[in-house]
Amino acid sequence: MNSLASNTPLNGTPVSEAPATSSEPVNMFETMVANPIKVSRLQSNGVLTGPAANTKSIHYSLANFNVFQSLPKETARGVDDLTRMEMALLSGIPEEIKWSLKKYLTYSNKAPYMISLRTLPDLLPLFKTFILPLERIVEGLNKSSICDSKAMDSLQMGLNALLILRNLAQDTDSVQILVKDREIKSFILFILKKFQCVATGDNKWQLYEGNATFFNELTHYTLDLMEAISSYIAPAMKDDHYFQTLVSILNYTKDRYMVISILRSLSRLLVRSKANEESAADNLDHKTLSLIVSFLLLECDSELIIASLDFLYQYILPGSQRITELFKSKECSLILEATLPNLLSYNIATPDYHLLQKHKIRLIKRLKPPAPKEPPNLSEDLFQQLFKLNEPLRSTAWLRCCFEPVQEAEFTQISLWRSYESKFGQPVRESGRKLLPAVEFIKNVSNAFNNAAAIVITDPVTGKKRFVIKGIQPRFKALGIADGERESQVPISALKSKFLNDSKEITPARQNSIPEVKFPQELSDVSKVACTFLCLLSNDTDDGAGSAFCQRIRPLVLHKLADIPPLTLALSEYMENTSGL
């Protein structure tokens, strides 16, 4: 009481004591004033865009804010993203694990090489801690819907981890690591077995309807993983569990994506099979073969057709021993006979011969081109012959060499005089002789051509007068003096022409253009696979079912060869094997 009274005034407010000195370091964050700031998304990303961006200030940092100038300088950079993600998985904190799996999922989709299982060997064991517990959860999917939040979180994290592995399995390095892991392969077979229970109606385990969504997603990821590893566990022996389970699912499912994935897996499981060894394909029954062959009827689905042909190719490949087994089914034989020739031209634009059948061929009329607007040029020899003549013989000879008498034709007087004057005016004056005057030259036209006359034509609309020479027009080619004098005496109509045999004076005979028939230059993927499969069938023995089949469809194949030239090379083996049948 005494101590309290001595330190407390009458108003009850304690008296502040002097701060005691301490050797402990002062925390700078305790004295820092909290100032609210606004940070845009571009600033937080470290890039400045828009009008403020320039060559000197491309990168933008949060350190530009004044509030960050007071931060301690003695700081160290944190761990990189991949280490941070791995530490989050190991933390055991649900929020951290979910964040980490989400980040890994993004990497597996956009940059799988960054988290390759070969370069980061610790990742697969971490993912397995979320995937393997799914077996226990799947065992309970036959009872009731998952209501427990903890179980739901485990299921979602397991599905995310499985999806990450599914994405990484598309990389060659990563899938080679997965194949070596027995637990992963055992998990894949476990999920496939559960789906087989659903397919076969096994009473021991049937999926509860409310859990179908989760199980369907799980099955899709598992089938993708199976497709990725199937090439590495081939060839499948006769009683291979993977092969048998996949066949059971194939006969049950109607899911297109699953069917294609299963067919690819089955094809890869048969790779490297040997004729002298028992194979998983020996267990296939006619029902399954007929189902796979029936997929060839779906002309709108190229992926499914290719997957089916790939499987059939691998099925009969080892020594071509199973060709007879394939054609034992009449249904398979009929479908193959109906579809294979058509698949050779799948998605290929074949020539349209109907255009030629409908097109009427017409010859274009041979018409004389319109008369030239200027007199023809004179050869040097003809010019010298005319130049030596005196007037009016020179003008008369020039008119007959360069013009022809045409009854309905006309040529302006001024153009006629200028053409003559431009040819001979200067050379004649330089020789000391005189050119025939223009008036006399126009009068002389009647002497050169009996039916030609200088007339004046008045336009009835405008009243303008045109001074023309009626009855002549320029020739296409100048004649010699003797030929010109002879031809000038016989006038012709405007519909006829002199020297019709001269190809330069008339248009050559030609027909109207016909539609162009275009032949394809490339084969489609389906066509290539069909060619490969057909060539394999043709390798059967002469009395085998495959050879008989190839012989039956040969006329149809020849028709395709005529329409699609690239098929000639692709089917060269088939044509060689069937030539002597």
UniProtKB/Swiss-Prot annotation:
Domain of life: Eukaryota
Single GO term (MF): DNA binding
PROSITE patterns documented for this protein: RFX_DBD
Chain spans, region Disordered: 1-23
Gene Ontology CC terms, in alphabetical order: chromatin; RSC-type complex
Single GO BP term: nucleosome disassembly
Keyword terms of this UniProt record: Chromatin regulator, Nucleus, Phosphoprotein, Transcription, Transcription regulation
Keyword RNA-binding attached: no
DNA-binding region, residue range(s): 395-476
Role according to the record: Component of the chromatin structure-remodeling complex (RSC), which is involved in transcription regulation and nucleosome positioning. RSC is responsible for the transfer of a histone octamer from a nucleosome core particle to naked DNA. The reaction requires ATP and involves an activated RSC-nucleosome intermediate. Remodeling reaction also involves DNA translocation, DNA twist and conformational change.
Self-association and partners: Component of the two forms of the RSC complex composed of at least either RSC1 or RSC2, and ARP7, ARP9, LDB7, NPL6, RSC3, RSC30, RSC4, RSC58, RSC6, RSC8, RSC9, SFH1, STH1, HTL1 and probably RTT102. The complexes interact with histone and histone variant components of centromeric chromatin.
Other comment: Present with 2610 molecules/cell in log phase SD medium.
Record-stated family: Belongs to the RSC9 family.
PANTHER family with a match to the protein in the record: AT-RICH INTERACTIVE DOMAIN-CONTAINING PROTEIN 2
Record protein name field: Chromatin structure-remodeling complex subunit RSC9
Source organism: Saccharomyces cerevisiae (strain ATCC 204508 / S288c)
